[in-house]
Each structure stands twice: as C-alpha cells, then as structure tokens.
C-alpha cells in the first residue's frame, strides 16, 4: 500500500459499521498516511471520537462550529489538505446529501469544498441500498467522478441478509489507493502470465520449477490499480488474486498455451512472466509409478513455445513483453530471446544475483528493447519493477 506522505480525510457517518472505520484509520496510519477524521454527530453515538484520535494521532472533528481549532476555517483547510477524501461508512442519508449538494454538517460541508478525489463506501440495510433513490444518488456521484466501493453481501446487524455490509479493510484500502493512483492504463487490456507450470508424471508426481508467481502477480495488481482490464493466467501458486484482476487458473504448459492464445487477440499488452516448463513427460502414467530396484528413465517431450507463438501472431499495435531467467550469459541469452521471439521488450534477471529470482520481494533486472537500447535499474521491489515495466510499455504504445 502506497500512502506515505498522503493526507487522507476520513469521514465517518452514523451507521453501525462506524466501528469498522477504526481499523481503517489504524491501517492507513500504519502505512504512512496522515489521517484526519471527520464525524457526523450520529457517528459519535456509535463510536467515540477519542478512538480515532488515539489511532490517527490527530483530533477528530465533529462540530462544524467547534471553536477549539486554530484560526483557519477548518472545513476549508481540511478540504485543501486532502489528497483523498473518504466517506466510510457512507449512510443513505449522507449519500443523498452529497448527490444534492447539501452541506449541513462537518462532513458534507468539507466534501462540498474539496477538490480531492472522493471515495464513497456505502453501508446500510439492504432495502435502503437497493432503493431506487439510493441507486440514483450513487449513479449521480459516479457521474461526477466519485469512486464508489460496492458494499459486500452477508448478514447485517438488523438481522437481514443481503448487500449492504461495509467491505473488509483491505478492500477499502485498495479502493482508496486506486483513487490516489493515476488511471493512465484505463481502457487498456493487459494479459499477464505468472507462476510455474506442473507436468504430470503420474497421478502423484509432476515436473515443475521454483517460481512463486510474485513478479507476475505484482504486474497484474499494479496494472489493475492503474485502471487496466487485467487477465492473469496463473500456474499453481499460494498467492491471493490481486483485487480488480480476472484470474484464470491452469496447471500445465499446454493449458497455459490454450488459455493465453485464446485471449491474446483482444490484448493491448501481453506480459509473459510465468516460468513455463520447456518439457513434459512424453507419457503420463495412469497409476502411481512404483519404486523399483533400478533407475527410472523418463522420456521428455517439448512443450509448445507460448512466447514464440505470441510473437508470430502479434497484431499491429500490440506490445509483447517476455522474461528471461538465466544463470549464465544473461544479456547475450536475453538479447537472443528478444529477437527470436519477436518481443518488444524483455525483462532479464539472473538467479545468481542476491535479491533477485524466485521467492524474493525484490528483483534486479535489465530491460531490453527491440530498438536496441537497454535499461538497468538498481535493485527494487517487485511492485516498483512492475510499475516500471508498465511505464515503458505505456510509453511505447504512445509513440
């Protein structure tokens, strides 16, 4: 989460979900945000302002006419200070006020004055949420560029079940970060492959590699955060699907070949970060192979070359990025792969470099481009490298 140096004005309104805003405040603060909490008077009936003051380190403001603040007109100073303005939970009442420009408390008055992006997280009874008036008000806010985080479904405090629950904190954090992030990939379709493949020897054993999928998942997550429509074709991993990403699970290289090639034509960027097995057992035993006294010899067959097939079928305007993991002759091998596979860009890294490779949160990479130039950034997090890769692809797409 990227909140360091950002001022988040968090508005808490009067619903039972107000208590969940305490965890949101804590997580924002832990991730480096300056959190300024505004509350409606009804919100203060559900949870004490002191809770938010303790968690944020700042005074929580309830009364528009509180005379204990410094000389600035507080709702104006907070409106100007905000990098993002968040209403969570947002009741039907405050949504209606926001849609119609009513400013009769600290929350709605400051909202009317801010020029920051606004995030609204509705939380209310299902009937109130589904009411056409509420839905019309939400559409009005969407039309004005507000970021609406849809409520979750489940058991509600009133005893009903349905839509209306305030989403979990991680979903709220993602929505807030997205509002803070430039949507420069909006309208782009991006396909990312990630993780290992598994090639079955028998019903128990398989051939695979050490890939965890972290790099590909980082790329998919950052692309979605920046507004792209993202498809992630993933081999078996223990990673959670990044929010906003459509994940397609596969197991073998042939599965990945089919999943990728069937979707390739619609993509603007294809980023093939998966560690795909080059070979598979020529035959897969129907029963578990039993241990004998001698050696076990397994004949291997070549898997289809997904990157090469994408390079052949690449349509005009489509950009193809491959990856190369090497243990020797890194740049020579990477340059050869870039040319042979008709890539526009290739990300090369060495398993020998400390801080690079499988299972690390960082990477050390050289970016090679079809026009011959290279870029060698210093060690960075995989999320930062993901953004760099996307930046370069976006730059090429605009030429």
What are the language-model segments listed below?
Residues 1-120, 125-399:
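A cross-family phosphate/adenosyl-ligand binding-site feature
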């Amino acid at each position: 989460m990227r909140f360091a140096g950002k001022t988040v004005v968090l508005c808490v309104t009067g619903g039972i979900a107000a208590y969940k805003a305490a965890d949101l405040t804590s997580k924002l603060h832990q991730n480096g945000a300056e959190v300024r909490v505004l509350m409606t008077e009804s919100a203060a009936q559900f949870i004490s302002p002191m809770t938010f003051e303790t968690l944020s380190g700042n005074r929580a403001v309830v009364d528009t006419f509180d005379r204990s603040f410094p000389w600035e007109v507080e709702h104006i100073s907070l409106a100007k200070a905000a990098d993002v303005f968040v209403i969570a939970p947002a009741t039907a009442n405050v949504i209606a006020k926001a849609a119609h420009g009513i400013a009769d408390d600290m929350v709605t008055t400051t909202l009317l004055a801010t020029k920051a992006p606004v995030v609204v997280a509705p939380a209310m009874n299902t009937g109130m949420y589904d009411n056409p008036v509420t839905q019309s008000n939400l559409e009005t806010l969407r039309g004005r560029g507000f970021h609406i985080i849809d409520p979750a479904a489940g058991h509600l405090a009133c005893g009903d079940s349905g839509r209306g629950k305030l989403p979990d904190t991680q979903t709220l954090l993602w929505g807030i970060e997205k509002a803070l992030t430039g949507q420069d990939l909006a309208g782009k379709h991006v396909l990312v492959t990630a993780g290992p493949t598994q090639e079955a020897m028998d019903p128990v054993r398989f051939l695979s590699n050490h890939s965890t999928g972290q790099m590909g998942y980082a790329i998919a997550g950052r692309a979605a955060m920046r507004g792209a429509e993202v498809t992630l074709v993933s081999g078996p991993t223990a990673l959670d699907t990044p929010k906003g990403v459509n994940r397609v699970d596969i197991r073998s290289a042939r599965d990945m070949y089919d999943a990728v090639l069937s979707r390739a034509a619609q993509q603007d960027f294809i980023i093939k970060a998966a560690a795909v097995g080059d070979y598979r057992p020529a035959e897969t035993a129907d029963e578990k192979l039993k241990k004998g006294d001698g050696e076990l010899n397994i004949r291997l067959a070549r898997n289809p070359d997904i990157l090469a097939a994408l390079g052949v079928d690449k349509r005009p305007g489509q950009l193809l990025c491959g990856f190369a993991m090497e243990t020797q002759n890194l740049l020579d091998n990477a340059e050869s792969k870039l040319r042979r596979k008709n890539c526009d860009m290739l990300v090369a890294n060495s398993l020998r470099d400390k801080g690079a490779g499988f299972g690390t949160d960082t990477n050390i990479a050289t970016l090679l481009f079809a026009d011959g130039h290279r870029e060698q950034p210093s060690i960075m997090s995989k999320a930062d490298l993901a953004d760099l890769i996307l930046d370069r692809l976006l730059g090429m797409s605009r030429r």
